[in-house]
Amino acid sequence: MKAQEIIKSIEAEYLKSDLPTIHVGDTVRVGVRISEGGKERIQPYEGTVIAMRNGGISETITVRKIFQGVGVERVFLLHSPIIAAITVIRRGKVRRAKLYYLRDRVGKATRIRQRFDRPL
């Protein structure tokens, strides 16, 4: 058994199986676990997926939103225990794998057309 196969078999135990299918351009709501003191709560973070990186357990999505007029981007490890839930709010129709051009746009220019051929 090769080393790469051993690593994949160990990582397979920690992969989440209940993740929805996410594509670039989708609007998602990510529930992030935050522990303050002795309490734990789930904070929602909603935005547009502008990038995805595949790679087994290190699979990530970059989510962008506008907060108080400032663009905020956050990278989430999909299989991390910090992420409680991911829900797709809206499907987006884009023709790029990375939507970094949205960083330079302001206001209504950042809108993405809705896609109806994929179910939520």
Swiss-Prot record:
GO molecular function: structural constituent of ribosome
UniProt cross-references to PROSITE patterns, sorted A to Z: RIBOSOMAL_L19
GO biological process per UniProt: translation
InterPro entries the UniProt entry points to: Ribosomal_bL19 (IPR001857), Ribosomal_bL19_CS (IPR018257), Ribosomal_bL19_sf (IPR038657), Translation_prot_SH3-like_sf (IPR008991)
Annotated transmembrane regions: none
Gene Ontology CC terms, in alphabetical order: cytosolic large ribosomal subunit
Gene3D superfamilies found in the cross-reference section: 2.30.30.790
Keyword annotations: Ribonucleoprotein, Ribosomal protein
Family named by the database record: Belongs to the bacterial ribosomal protein bL19 family.
Function: This protein is located at the 30S-50S ribosomal subunit interface and may play a role in the structure and function of the aminoacyl-tRNA binding site.
Protein's recorded name: Large ribosomal subunit protein bL19
